[in-house]
């Protein structure tokens, strides 16, 4: 879809869990992994040994960041086929996820520590980009993605998800819901009572939801209760605001940008460039090209990775031709 500020898209809300990103965090033995693996059609990606007491769950062994990249590539390269088998992808857990990524970047640049790379200036940006690209790829094709994290207190005693801020930022920022789980101890028979889930921030802990009408507290945290809370939140929004929720695919199409084709862009640039040249405006064409590509670089030298830059050049040339 071509970009036109005078014909903007109108945001829509998708029903169901498809395409939702959820972070679940809390201390140990609260049911984070157990309930996540009870979501629909799960595939579990263990960055730590979370399945030792849970049987019957489909998983992919993850022993390195390279393993994760390969799995992520298969999930996203042919997403429609993958979604026939899986609906929920579970990443367990975020802090270990960060450590695997750190090790990978160190190996990539042949250094012992992230801070040793780049002549002592560190490889923080490379590390951050590596993590962001893989997360962005995973959450962009329509799976329900669940990130599991441990909990840690800040200096003031408030509880937050535990992990490197460079990894937590893209996880939390992209999460539609961040749940904090709290223990309910044991009953009179000394049997564990299911934990409770918080979906809104308090003075004691961080949590949040993008859904204004969602229940902010689930007395009993289960996969079924979480799914029910999300579905009901969208239904309440429909009733309160008079909207009609759409499918994930409809929402994705609504949010899509123009698909850029290298050959089409090159042909259009050449065609408009020739017209401008016939008008004696070659110098202006060169000014636009050099502004975006650098002095002495021609559009015909662009690679297929530069379609974004080419699309901007084409827009500028169209404006020039219209003057």
Curated annotation (Swiss-Prot):
Source superkingdom: Bacteria
Keyword Coiled coil among UniProt keywords: yes
Keywords, comma-separated and alphabetical: Coiled coil
Entry coiled-coil feature ranges: 222-272
Pfam (any one): AAA_24
Name of the molecule in the record: SPbeta prophage-derived uncharacterized protein YorG
Biological source species: Bacillus subtilis (strain 168)
Phylogenetic placement of the source organism: Bacteria, Bacillati, Bacillota, Bacilli, Bacillales
Record gene name: yorG
């Amino acid at each position: 879809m071509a970009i036109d500020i005078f014909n903007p898209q109108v945001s829509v809300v998708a029903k169901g869990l498809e395409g939702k990103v959820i972070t679940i965090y809390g201390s140990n033995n609260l049911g984070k992994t157990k309930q996540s693996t009870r979501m629909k059609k799960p595939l579990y990606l263990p960055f730590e040994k979370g399945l030792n007491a849970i049987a019957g769950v489909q998983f992919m062994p993850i022993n390195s960041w390279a393993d994760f990249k390969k799995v992520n590539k298969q999930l996203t390269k042919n997403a429609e086929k993958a979604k026939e088998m899986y609906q929920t992808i579970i990443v367990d857990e975020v802090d270990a996820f960060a450590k695997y990524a750190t090790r990978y970047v160190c190996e990539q640049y042949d250094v012992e520590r992230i801070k040793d790379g780049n002549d002592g200036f560190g490889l923080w940006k490379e590390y951050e980009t590596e993590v962001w690209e893989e997360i962005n790829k995973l959450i962009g094709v329509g799976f329900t993605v669940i990130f599991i994290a441990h909990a840690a207190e800040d200096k003031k005693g408030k509880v937050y998800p535990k992990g490197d801020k460079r990894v937590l930022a893209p996880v939390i920022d992209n999460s539609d819901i961040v749940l904090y789980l709290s223990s309910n101890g044991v009953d009179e028979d000394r049997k564990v009572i299911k934990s409770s889930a918080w979906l809104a921030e308090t003075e004691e802990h961080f949590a949040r939801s993008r859904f204004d009408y969602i229940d902010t507290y689930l007395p009993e945290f289960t996969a079924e209760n979480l799914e029910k809370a999300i579905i009901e939140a969208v239904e309440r929004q429909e009733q309160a605001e008079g909207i009609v929720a759409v499918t994930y695919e409809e929402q994705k199409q609504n949010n899509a940008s123009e698909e850029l084709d290298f050959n089409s862009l090159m042909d259009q640039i050449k065609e408009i460039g020739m017209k401008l040249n016939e008008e004696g405006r070659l110098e202006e064409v060169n000014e636009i090209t050099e502004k975006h590509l650098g002095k002495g670089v021609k559009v015909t030298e662009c690679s297929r990775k530069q379609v974004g830059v080419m699309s901007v050049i084409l827009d500028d040339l169209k404006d020039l031709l219209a003057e």
